[in-house]
Amino acid sequence: MTENKLSPKTKKVYQYLSHLFNNGQLLAGEQIPSEIEIAETLAVSRPTVAKAVNIFVREGKAYRKSGIGTFLRNPAADKKKKKTIGLVFPLIGLSEIFRPITEGIAKLSETLNFSLIWGGQFNRANITGTQTEQMIDFYIEQNVDGILFAPVELTRNCFSINKKIISKIEKCNIPIVLVDGEYHEFPLRSKYDLVGIDNFRAGYVSALHFIEQGAKRVDFLCQPFMAQTVPQRIKGYQQALLDSGITPHKTWVHDIRNFSSKELLPLIQNGAQNIICANDNTAMKFIKALSDADIKIPKDVRLSGFDDIEAARYFPVPLTTVAQPCKDLAEVIIHTMLTRIENPYLPARNLMLDFELKIRESSKIPG
């Protein structure tokens, strides 16, 4: 921490706390004086004390116990102590990539000396702010050292829920690593580390696969309230069209609420033949609707997806898809968190791993 950046009064409190920390006036694990006591001792306001204490906590020199107070850390003991990491993947049951990532993180727990705890998953239709608060309260009670957070999606109030989760974690100065995507809408960027794939490039490569086969039009199919990875995929897909001399039209991006043949047939009738789906689950719904309408893949319509879910290769027509490196993601995610715990003031990092476009029958344009 650069003390010169602090106001004189905040600096005074910070130096007082540092004196307690460095000179052994309080032992590790002992509670520091209350904000009222420090304010009276140093003749400063409580908000000034709170600001200095927050800095001290963020630097890892102290920790809070909810409803009790703030306590000094023992740096040497903390380095040996097994870290506890909380997992917030609320919709793990709806996205297959999170399960292998979670399994990969769990496998690393012994060699990297950390414990992983999970507060459960939510029902998509019934996610509430109360549920998320209860889950975060559980992690706070467990005194976790960090939280891995994959933002909520596919529900109308997902942005407010995500902000509620982040706000509650922030108040306790618990390190956060975002998994897969940002919780802000583009172009906003949060102050937290983010680990995922380069979704812009993945969208670009998916579109290029169709363009290189001679396609002059490529459409993109998504659903409402999807993760912030999807807008990045759309931007990449549109850039590939532009770079190939094709002007992308807004009408080529389809936000589908009802995957019925009745709703999807006009899309095909209006010229959509080569279609990128926002993920494999979206593709699976689309394939069923096409089958109900007796539209053949890849003869009449070609499509691709993202995530390479287990079923993708076993679809009636195997699905071309962007495979995410879940094992590598797990390793980078946990190393990022452990680094963040030890170095809370590092700048926020965007860690983007490579992916593989697995080309199967669903995207092959007939010769």
Question: Where do the protein language model's features map onto the residues?
Answer:
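A short alpha-helical element within helix-turn-helix/winged-helix DNA-binding domains
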Residues: 29-42, 267, 357
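Hinge/beta->alpha junction and helix N-cap segments in small-molecule ligand-binding domains
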Residues: 90-100, 119-130, 153-157, 181, ...
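Conserved hydrophobic residue
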Residues: 26-27, 31-32, 62, 346
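Alpha-helical recognition/docking segments in bacterial nutrient-uptake
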Residues: 2-5, 15-22, 27, 37, ...
